[in-house]
Amino acid sequence: MNNKGSGLTPAQALDKLDALYEQSVVALRNAIGNYITSGELPDENARKQGLFVYPSLTVTWDGSTTNPPKTRAFGRFTHAGSYTTTITRPTLFRSYLNEQLTLLYQDYGAHISVQPSQHEIPYPYVIDGSELTLDRSMSAGLTRYFPTTELAQIGDETADGIYHPTEFSPLSHFDARRVDFSLARLRHYTGTPVEHFQPFVLFTNYTRYVDEFVRWGCSQILDPDSPYIALSCAGGNWITAETEAPEEAISDLAWKKHQMPAWHLITADGQGITLVNIGVGPSNAKTICDHLAVLRPDVWLMIGHCGGLRESQAIGDYVLAHAYLRDDHVLDAVLPPDIPIPSIAEVQRALYDATKLVSGRPGEEVKQRLRTGTVVTTDDRNWELRYSASALRFNLSRAVAIDMESATIAAQGYRFRVPYGTLLCVSDKPLHGEIKLPGQANRFYEGAISEHLQIGIRAIDLLRAEGDRLHSRKLRTFNEPPFR
């Protein structure tokens, strides 16, 4: 038995989502334009009828499927009933939504419906502020007479498993208001359009990795055998094979205007690589993951530098994190530090295999240069000044490296069900007298960065080949929403 009944097919649902969303956006933009030019206020009765609302997507399963799939990490129902969420930017998310709906429609015979919701689209999400010239009273008027962002209605309760049961269960981890909030922040922080983000994400904490990524990306765009067709850069540069002197074209400092600039190496099928320079510290790491998560990336990897804690390590060695000591504290309120963050087997294997492939060394030689162990992430940049306390923590945890971002990124991946991994390169050994000096650091990075970045890129190639198998069931909760 199936309960598709008179419901929509996935394609029909997506088309209706597009139509309802565009209808609301056009109405809201027109109303804003009328207010700015003539002072005309939006029609309150029309608003009550849903003039500016997001579309709502509801999927219902009657529990009749005899052999529901149990091995995949998404596209599953935990119980019979109706699941719903609001949707924004359906064109941007069309491929993702189609995949999720198709699984539920084909494997469960789910009934799909689309209708206007009761939640209005905040006006800042449909206009480009740079195109408006508003005085103080006009800005206040927009906030007074048009729907605005209400922080009380935005949160991660579903992702954190603390939502209150109602007639409808959540269909996805993020509703439209939460997604729109993060899409706006992503553009602000990274300096690039959200449409350019790719599903395979590299994080780094050092600018030189960006230089190498841009150099390699430009060479890939010029290679007719490469799948990469364009490079989108922080600050607005867009590089293709037709761009003259591409590296010169993006050598300006436009990216410096942005807190966490991003570069997107784009493929025709949207399966490329995004690199984000998150800078230093767990606060930035938490922030970017909070917002990137709404795009539902396939994986994010930390590829940066760290302090080596073991005497046997050498400058330039690698550390593959298999556990984390979370001394970053930025997530303690939502994910207590006593909750273990498991390593993801598929990601660990890809990073190790990529190290062998890129270095060209056999397994035994790789093990001499690659150390697997616990990485400490601290929020104290000067942890060295508390040597006694720090040394005790390192001894108890058997830590092999320290940085300020990796555990935060892994914890956020765990929280938001995004596969995660960490491969760091030892840049200094402060416990053993090997500290970074300016000239020494330059020579080290010139030799190490290219190989390290190539390992991250090769690991992404391996993970891309995994397909849906990359998404691990170990990140699911007991009452997981059906959508990935």
From Swiss-Prot:
Gene3D superfamilies attached to this UniProt entry: AMP nucleoside phosphorylase, N-terminal domain, Nucleoside phosphorylase domain
Family that this chain belongs to: Belongs to the AMP nucleosidase family.
Induction entry: By cAMP at limiting phosphate concentrations. Repressed by phosphate.
Keyword terms: Allosteric enzyme, Hydrolase
Organism: Escherichia coli (strain K12)
Descriptive protein name: AMP nucleosidase
One Gene Ontology molecular-function label: AMP nucleosidase activity
Enzyme Commission number, as recorded: 3.2.2.4
Domain of life: Bacteria
EC main group: hydrolase
Pfam families listed in its UniProt record: AMNp_N, PNP_UDP_1
Description of how the protein assembles with itself and partners: Homohexamer. Trimer of dimers.
Miscellaneous comment text of the record: AMP nucleosidase binds AMP at the catalytic site, Mg-ATP at an allosteric regulatory site, and inorganic phosphate also at a regulatory site.
Regulation (activators, inhibitors): Allosterically activated by Mg-ATP. Inhibited by inorganic phosphate and formycin monophosphate.
Gene Ontology cellular component annotations, sorted alphabetically: cytosol
Biological role stated in the UniProt entry: Catalyzes the hydrolysis of the N-glycosidic bond of AMP to form adenine and ribose 5-phosphate. Involved in regulation of AMP concentrations.
InterPro entries in the record: AMN_phosphorylase (IPR047039), AMP_N_sf (IPR037109), AMP_nucleosidase (IPR011271), AMP_nucleoside_Pase_N (IPR018953), Nucleoside_phosphorylase_d (IPR000845), Nucleoside_phosphorylase_sf (IPR035994)
Coiled-coil ranges per UniProt: none
